[in-house]
Amino acid sequence: MRIALGIEYDGSGYFGWQRQAEVDSVQGQLEQALSKVANEPISLFCAGRTDAGVHATGQVVHFETNAIRNEGAWTLGVNANLPDNIAVRWAKEVDDTFHARFSATARRYRYVIYNHNFRPGILRHGVSHYHGDIDTDKMHVAAQALLGEQDFTSFRAIQCQSKTPFRNVHSVKVTRQGMYVIVDISANAFLHHMVRNIVGSLLEIGLGNQPLTWMADLLALKDRNQAAATAKPNGLYLVDVTYPEQYQLPKLALGPLFMLD
């Protein structure tokens, strides 16, 4: 039996999604909880491996099991065995053609910036703090240069293991809600650190340190060293993964917090 799960987590206390020896990971916690409910070892496959400190409101995973359980066991039962900063939001049996990573047609991330002179207290792990006057209109206009299938070498981490730097960005929006700036970006897939590297460079435009054409210039340069520093991890959320309609997976509000679609 193959089961898909929708997962939400606060990544601030973990060394990323991927299971690692001797450090705490989201995958490790989930596999441990699932194995208790299934009464057998469970191995997970995910839609997107998030880095240390990065969060998710719409992560999707799947696993194989011989255990016969109802959906309540895979949600309430697993949640009872998870720490408070990880939660299963839904569970659904899927056919053998479904794969959390390879069946996905798009991923969507949101990066949340707290734009204020003083750092936040309550949301310090869930937003990135940047002071100074950020012009979101300039950021949004500049970001449109990223649309379409392009070579994103300038926005991939040096240690990125992808065989190709090409990705297809479907949409990118930069908006403001009061003191919060939200960068919302969707693509077929993302390179390692791609979203955070894009945000870091967009911020330079928003702060007036670079011209509107800078994103297009960076794409043409194909040189990571020419772009801005990587934005902090704590403002980044994986909010949605898109799959073909044949799988009929649940669609929940994207989040995080008060963010509107």
From Swiss-Prot:
Active site: D51 (nucleophile)
A biological-process GO annotation: tRNA pseudouridine synthesis
GO molecular function: RNA binding; tRNA pseudouridine(38-40) synthase activity
CDD domains linked: PseudoU_synth_EcTruA
UniProt-listed Gene3D superfamilies: Pseudouridine synthase I, catalytic domain, C-terminal subdomain, Pseudouridine synthase I, catalytic domain, N-terminal subdomain
Key word Transmembrane present: no
Swiss-Prot/TrEMBL catalytic activity: uridine(38/39/40) in tRNA = pseudouridine(38/39/40) in tRNA
UniProt keyword Oxidoreductase, yes or no: no
Classification via Pfam families: PseudoU_synth_1
EC number(s) stated in the UniProt entry for this protein: 5.4.99.12
Keywords of this entry: Isomerase, tRNA processing
Positions contributing to substrate binding: Y109
Functional summary from the UniProt entry: Formation of pseudouridine at positions 38, 39 and 40 in the anticodon stem and loop of transfer RNAs.
Listed HAMAP family: TruA
Annotated family: Belongs to the tRNA pseudouridine synthase TruA family.
Identification of the protein by name: tRNA pseudouridine synthase A
Organism in which the protein naturally occurs: Shewanella sp. (strain ANA-3)
Gene: truA
